[in-house]
Amino acid sequence: MTEQASNGAAQDGQNAQFSLQRIYVRDLSFEAPKAPEIFRQDWKPSVQLDLNTRQKALDGGDFYEVVLSLSVTVKTGEEVAFIAEVQQAGIFLIKGLDAEAMGHTLGAFCPSLLFPYAREALDNLVVRGSFPALMLAPVNFDVLYAQELARMQAEGQASGTVQ
């Protein structure tokens, strides 16, 4: 019985399929509201990064769009130097995963593939805006996903529902 169960699990894993179909910029914006005056000030930046992900199933059920949104607001003193935003998206073919693996793939693995593209797009915008290069540190999407799961579980327990 155990051998049959483990063979079934191996077959399920063999049927799993993951493929990146396309990476694209969904939205991109840059604002320098205090230019050109901001260029004459001492450059002492403070950086605020907002990060968000979302995903949706596309027609056919095995294709998913994952969108990684990054918004960077940089201030020098109290003045906003610039705001740069990107929605970096990808289309992924994902088949044969259980619910837990699918959640992790869409919530952590796919965004980690998109992040280098989003980071490069933001850096390019900032440099073209005549500001120093923006070097965003790598993001551990596995940790962010685990934190989100823990938050959702805590909210479920607080409201009396089981997830």
From Swiss-Prot:
**Keyword hit for GTP-binding:** no
One GO biological process from the UniProt record? protein folding
Can you say where in the cell this protein is located? Cytoplasm
Q: Name one Pfam family in it.
A: SecB
Gene Ontology cellular component list: cytoplasm
Q: Which domain of life is it from?
A: Bacteria
The signal peptide, as residue positions, is none
What are the alphabetically sorted keywords of the record? Answer: Chaperone, Cytoplasm, Protein transport, Translocation, Transport
Q: Which GO terms describe its molecular function?
A: unfolded protein binding
Q: Does the keyword Protein transport apply?
A: yes
InterPro entries named in the record: SecB, SecB-like_sf
Share what the entry says about its subunit structure, partners included: Homotetramer, a dimer of dimers. One homotetramer interacts with 1 SecA dimer.
**What function is annotated for this protein?**
One of the proteins required for the normal export of preproteins out of the cell cytoplasm. It is a molecular chaperone that binds to a subset of precursor proteins, maintaining them in a translocation-competent state. It also specifically binds to its receptor SecA.
Q: Which HAMAP family match?
A: SecB
Family of the protein in this entry? Belongs to the SecB family.
Protein name as annotated = Protein-export protein SecB
